[in-house]
């Protein structure tokens, strides 16, 4: 984590951010990280989680449902109602 700031999180893809978050969780669960470093990586984890949440929300907003005709052929799309 040395040299990394939370600003670089914004440039990460969802997969990169999720991988980094999973590593942080593993490190914290092992419990062999010094307290000051635990606090720093926890804060980074919060930034990674927020970034992943934003990217997921953006992806959900783009998902569309395919409309089918009576004979089952695709005729267009409409926004997906996730509720």
Swiss-Prot record:
One of its GO terms (cellular component) is exodeoxyribonuclease VII complex. It comes from the Bacteria. It is an enzyme of class 3 (hydrolase). It catalyses: Exonucleolytic cleavage in either 5'- to 3'- or 3'- to 5'-direction to yield nucleoside 5'-phosphates. Pfam families: Exonuc_VII_S. Its main location: cytoplasm. Gene3D superfamilies: Exonuclease VII, small subunit. The keyword rRNA processing does not apply. Its EC number is 3.1.11.6. One of its GO terms (biological process) is DNA catabolic process. One of its GO terms (molecular function) is exodeoxyribonuclease VII activity. It is found in: Cytoplasm. Keywords: Cytoplasm, Exonuclease, Hydrolase, Nuclease. NCBIfam families: PRK00977.1-3 (NF002139), xseB (TIGR01280). Belongs to the XseB family. Bidirectionally degrades single-stranded DNA into large acid-insoluble oligonucleotides, which are then degraded further into small acid-soluble oligonucleotides. Heterooligomer composed of large and small subunits. This is Exodeoxyribonuclease 7 small subunit. It comes from Mesorhizobium japonicum (strain LMG 29417 / CECT 9101 / MAFF 303099).
């Amino acid at each position: 984590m040395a040299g990394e700031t939370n600003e670089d999180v914004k440039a990460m893809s969802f997969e990169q951010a999720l991988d980094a978050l999973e590593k942080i969780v593993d490190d914290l669960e092992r419990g062999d990280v010094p307290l000051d470093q635990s606090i720093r990586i926890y804060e980074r984890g919060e930034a990674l989680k927020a970034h992943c949440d934003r990217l997921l929300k953006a992806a959900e907003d783009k998902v569309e449902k395919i409309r089918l005709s009576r004979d089952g052929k695709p005729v267009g799309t409409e926004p997906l109602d996730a509720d």
